[in-house]
Amino acid sequence: MSDTEIASFQKEIAGKPVGERIALWAEKFVGTPYDPDPLGEYVTRKVIVADEHADCMYLSFRAVELAMGLTPEEAVNIALDKRFINRGKLGNNGKVLNYEDRFQYGEDMIDSDRWGREITGEFGKVTEITGSRGREKVKIISKKTMLNCSNGSSGLNGSSCFSKLRDGDFIFFIKAVEKRKVGEIVGHIGIVKTEVRSQKSEVRDNEEQRAESKDQREIYLIHASGLKNKGGKVKKVRLSDYINSMPFIGIRVSRFN
């Protein structure tokens, strides 16, 4: 998108809650090719904006920056805060000077308190797993707990433990301890998008048929689906479908208020 198009959409959705804005911006990236650069194209090029490709980290960064900024320029300034453990610095040529100080681990993002408030414990019984990189233990919602939700009569999308998910919530997917390569706890990140769909059903009332409208809330995950050596793209999928087939052992969740 051009700066003009970005500014127009920022203005269009400015009155919506921040979570909705995050989800709407994430949705704008659906179909974007997966970033094949091992470091991330934005890191290699030392730029803030590299919207031609996206991995899960860049999608997370950009959706929040664009949602919180009122202009494209303000989004860049927000990026200097959100992407970095301390704060990003730009040179006179607009290039990033200190990408080595960026968030490289999803667990560092959620534990920084700058990537929303952690709400993991609101979705069911938490399980403790072995941590790494200075964390003795980490509390997660296990995949087993999530699948138990999906086996309920209303399914994962409508189950009580996930009915609290809101637009723009961040889901951090947790790797099995034995699959960690460089001490990483989080293996993937996605953004929640909810939609309400109306369904009509026929009911009988006083021997007369009438149409009754029922709203069904669907929960989607927007995420950069791919591998650095195989490609892919940003997808929007049912959260229940992703949970059923995901290679991760659980999740943590954060929310911007």
Predicted feature descriptions by range:
Residues M1-K139, K164, K181-G183:
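N-terminal capping segments
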Residues I6, Q10, T44, G155, ...:
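Generic preference for well-ordered secondary structure
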Residues W25-A26, S60, G155-G158, R166-D167, ...:
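Generic detector of short, locally flexible boundary/turn motifs and exposed helical patches
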Residues I48-D55, N77, E207, D215, ...:
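Bimodal feature
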Residues N77, N86, N92-N93, N98, ...:
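Detector for Asparagine
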Residues S153-L156, T194-E218, N257:
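Short, basic, low-complexity termini and linkers enriched in Ser/Thr/Gly/Pro
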Residues F162, D167-A176, E184-G187, I191-T194, ...:
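Low-complexity, Gly/Ser/Thr/Pro-rich intrinsically disordered linker/tail segments
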